[in-house]
Amino acid sequence: MLTTTDCSSPGRNNVWLHILAGLCASLVSIGLARFAYTPLIPSLIGAHWFSASDVIYLSAANLIGYLIGALAGRPIAARLSNGHSLRLMMLLATASFFACAFPLSITWFFSWRLLSGIAGGAIMVLVAATVIPHVPAARKGLASGAIFLGVGLGIAGSGTLVPFLLSLGLRDAWIGLGLVSLLLTAVSWFGWPSTSATAAVNAAAVQNAQPGKPAPLDAAVYLLFGQYALMAVGLVPAMVFLVDYVTRGQGASAHIGALIWVMYGVGAILGPVIYGFLADHLGARNSIRLVLLVQALAVAGLCLTHSYPLLALLVVIIGSFPPGIVPLALARIHELVPGHEQQQVAWSRATVSFATFQALAGYGYSVVFNGNGGHHVMLFAIAAGAIAVALIADIGLALINRKSAAAEQTPSPDATV
């Protein structure tokens, strides 16, 4: 039987096992549990499982659960340990697929979609905190990108695997997703760091930490929380309305719409690894600035182009954003916050900020979309504006800090006498 040990022994193999387990967790709980639902929506309505209004109501369950899970993740881990909590959450997400194969009632379905969201939020808070401390410092960005590659694979799978499963039937599609999740849960089961290995890493972190009370979080950390929230606002329109924009907004065929969604999935696969690589080589702050600039331009470009090749290119760039910003934000926290425990707290707060604004944005965009007669351009303009504000805020804080530092270094007239 395969067991996990501290990665300092035959170490490198164990590190990759930990990363593989993290990838499986993000794939099951977010990649599939959230994004595989989108292509199932027409079939849920067409098969008369639920009405169109009920399906929209059920769509919110996962986002609400994600926020609950982000808040509950660390308290659960404090009772069960990180490894046991991650296994439990993967089982919960897997069970939700099988449960949703039987639409007993709206309450039943909503409850299981809510539980799948709770699993996703808890895993997002815990998975990096469980795996990354075992990774060499020079590879943390790339490793976090590999972990959250699962989100991108889930987005891509929503455009490829789900249509195949739907050809077998709606109930079979849910069961098929459950079987895939069960397989991934089994693959990851023994890949998590052992309790002894985690204890050793935590002890080393405590030994290397500065004595005294933890330092309060500085302005740059709170800026990151705000940026991460604005990123959530910026990614929702493409994530929810992209295919509808291409097919109904631009008059393209359903086939073109499906191809565009596949391109979004390609970007989602590339994003975590590329962004993690950038974090390792450019630093997290510079990488975030670069990504925000490129994303703001790409999202704004959706409003301006009617060329399908250019649209496909923009969609690849935009698709890299939802899963790619996770390793970037995580790397920025590691730059700003000392100590493993404080980093976990900061990451949990960042995830809660993201989850809150993602849920609010999803509701807000729906209100705007219904209020303006179903025009998509305004949604993408708001999204581009939110991303631009995140970039401007970062540059603004840097300028303020630079002026403050210059003022402190300038000697007063009395000091020169």
Question: What are these regions, as identified by a protein language model?
Answer:
Residues 112-150:
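Cytoplasmic helix-loop-helix junction between adjacent transmembrane helices
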Residues 164-179, 367-387:
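A membrane-interface helix-boundary motif in multi-pass transporters
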Residues 49, 81, 102-108, 251, ...:
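Helix-breaking motifs and short loop linkers at transmembrane-helix boundaries and internal kinks
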Residues 340-372:
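A late C-terminal transmembrane helix in Major Facilitator Superfamily
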Residues 38, 220-262, 272:
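Extracytoplasmic gate region of multi-pass secondary transporters
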Residues 122-135, 324-338:
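Intracellular juxtamembrane helix-capping segments at the cytosolic ends
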Residues 107-115, 309-317:
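Paired small-residue
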Residues 145-193:
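Helix-loop-helix hairpin linking two adjacent transmembrane segments in secondary transporters
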